[in-house]
């Protein structure tokens, strides 16, 4: 439903930016509400929800995660350890290892899930307190382990946050059959393609934290 503005600062409310806003700006319950709301919007042509989405702080089994981005040799080959509060979303298709059991794995479906990840990120930066990073674990192909994530920094989407959500992600929400002709899909492709990474987790040897290692995906020639 439509949420009325509760203060003079409209940019901080759900009403002017998007019809939905979580009732909490914390990374626990706020991210959980965003995950539930966004997850229900994305469906197969049959009407079935594609993935279950969970959200919360950037941690693994209670241990905080530090993001370490390994750049390709072409981009300098450095490792950047990123600071700032983060949110972690997980998309699960409810098959083995969270693979999607319904429908066919197509490039269109993958693009639709990237649109969903972008929507999760935009809500998180707009509505949650002091979030600087959003990581979304994507569902794997059948027979594989989850290995692909999207990582967004707040600055990556500053332009989108300054406009209402529907300017970036117009309604109605597309499905795998309609995503390629949906308004603004080229912008979604551009905003998300460079944010795809192969992820791995490794325990830090210095403290009780975990490194979330993000490696660039091999580019298709």
Language-model features: where?
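Bimodal "functional hotspot" detector
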Residues: 1-115, 141-221
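Long, charged/polar, surface-exposed segments that mediate recognition or autoinhibition
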Residues: 110-127
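Residue-level detector of functional hotspots within protein domains
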Residues: 73-75, 117-122, 135
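A short amphipathic beta-strand at an alpha->beta junction
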Residues: 122-148
């Amino acid at each position: 439903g439509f949420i009325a503005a509760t203060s003079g600062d409209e940019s901080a409310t759900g009403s002017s930016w998007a019809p939905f806003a979580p009732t909490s700006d914390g990374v626990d319950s706020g991210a959980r509400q965003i995950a539930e709301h966004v997850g229900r919007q994305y469906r197969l042509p049959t009407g079935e929800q594609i993935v279950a989405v969970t959200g919360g702080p950037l941690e693994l089994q209670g241990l905080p995660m530090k993001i370490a981005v390994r750049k390709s040799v072409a981009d300098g080959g450095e490792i950047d350890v990123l600071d700032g509060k983060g949110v972690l979303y997980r998309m699960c298709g409810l098959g083995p290892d969270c693979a999607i059991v319904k429908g066919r794995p197509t490039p269109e479906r993958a693009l639709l899930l990237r649109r969903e990840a972008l929507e999760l990120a935009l809500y998180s930066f707009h509505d949650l307190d002091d979030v600087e990073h959003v990581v979304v674990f994507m569902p794997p192909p059948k027979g594989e382990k989850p290995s692909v994530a999207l990582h967004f920094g707040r600055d990556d989407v500053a332009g989108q946050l300054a406009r209402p959500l529907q300017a970036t992600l117009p309604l109605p929400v597309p499905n795998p059959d309609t995503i390629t002709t949906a308004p603004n899909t080229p912008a979604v492709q551009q905003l998300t393609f460079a944010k795809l990474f192969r992820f791995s987790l490794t325990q830090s040897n210095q403290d009780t934290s975990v490194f979330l290692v993000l490696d660039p995906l091999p580019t298709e020639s």
